[in-house]
């Protein structure tokens, strides 16, 4: 295979689209050292160490500003995001660096699809010198058939030079000697200095987030599943809100756990695998994910003892321990292709640590746009004296880190798709209330059931002040005392004080959208203070 068209020369050998069997042998063979080395665990899955980068490095992400992107991309100087600009000259220098690193080596080339829809999918080619990175790509992207591989033509190329270091970073105006950079004219991603596999996965998600909405297709950071009658639900939510847990439901088949599109035919997965967190994983609490960790799965940054036993509770390396596996490692999935019809339920998950939001409320179309653009969740951060103060996070479209267009473009496309399908939106709080405890998973699952089986639409409701949300007064299987968060406080004035605090944060965050007529009009759909 000739890789000279990419600037890679004198390659000693190319292992093209290796099988899982070949990858297992390559990543565990004797003589491998450092971060290239895979360890076989007692569950049969290989475990690797990704070095100092145990997560994405958003500060090292840059995109070439040229005629393609200048007027379409949502740049870092236009809003709080990671889309920092570089010029063609810096790109050329980084490309030389990566191609030099890969030239003269034995390389792995993996071809795959991003997106199950043949009309809009990206044909991805990843070139790397590290076997386990090739394995990660094979797990996470959609695996073409032998027939498809025979005529495969990439329309996006990822060159992963994890072993190279950029010593000229300061004069180039970059953040460090590591880089993850994109060129949308050349349709290429270059990676240098970081070994973290997620840079390839989320890099392609950012590209789908650019190309699809410009074609009127929703591109979503969400999980999706399908009921026995073919009804589809999508779950938006930031990390820790329950996106994976709640969409993995024995009564429903999984379409995907993280990245989806919504076009004229319905909802479709971008990926061929899952990338699950494994910190504190147990067979009892999450049997589906635990049972997916077997041969062909790839663990990252977990602690493996000498006998191959895995300590899932050990966070000494990172809280962000992960496993990637092909989607068919989950038993109850939509087959043969990870796609469904149009969604009729859209669920926004928020873990509110302020104890203000109701466990569930049905949203109007204007509220849907408002809460989608706000993308709110909150965490409890412990302080030295044991006092816990909630930390709010507002992440536009529940995926700010991966947006390449202005957030309003995603909201517009999503709402159009929802209106055409007659879909309803719901805000579900999986966080805390006035009792100081987190809303139980049993109550949250019963709420999700009520949304999916339609019983919530027949429930009596009342309006909650300040946030003006419509709240049901009773739902099957849900403790009625929690449905109005005010009832969980001994003194309702406590709720009101917290609600005013949170409302102020929502209002301040939304100010960035009020420079347009539509954004200014949406203010009325958010919380109101007298």
Swiss-Prot record:
PROSITE patterns recorded: PEPCK_ATP
UniProt GO BP: gluconeogenesis
Signal peptide (residue range): none
Catalytic activity: oxaloacetate + ATP = phosphoenolpyruvate + ADP + CO2
EC number: 4.1.1.49
Binding site for Mn(2+): 202, 221, 258
Cellular localization per UniProt: Cytoplasm
UniProt keyword annotations, A-Z: ATP-binding, Cytoplasm, Decarboxylase, Gluconeogenesis, Lyase, Manganese, Metal-binding, Nucleotide-binding
Gene Ontology molecular function terms on file: ATP binding; metal ion binding; phosphoenolpyruvate carboxykinase (ATP) activity
Binding site for substrate: 56, 196, 202, 322
One matching Pfam family: PEPCK_ATP
UniProt xrefs under InterPro entries: PEP_carboxykinase_ATP, PEP_carboxykinase_C, PEP_carboxykinase_N, PEPCK_ATP_CS
Residues engaged in binding ATP: 202, 221, 237-245, 286, 322, 438-439, 444
GO CC term (a single one): cytosol
Location (main, coarse): cytoplasm
Pathway: Carbohydrate biosynthesis; gluconeogenesis
Cofactor or coenzyme needed: Mn(2+)
Classification via PANTHER family: PHOSPHOENOLPYRUVATE CARBOXYKINASE (ATP), PHOSPHOENOLPYRUVATE CARBOXYKINASE ATP
HAMAP family membership: PEPCK_ATP (MF_00453)
Protein family: Belongs to the phosphoenolpyruvate carboxykinase (ATP) family.
Complex formation: Monomer.
Protein name: Phosphoenolpyruvate carboxykinase (ATP)
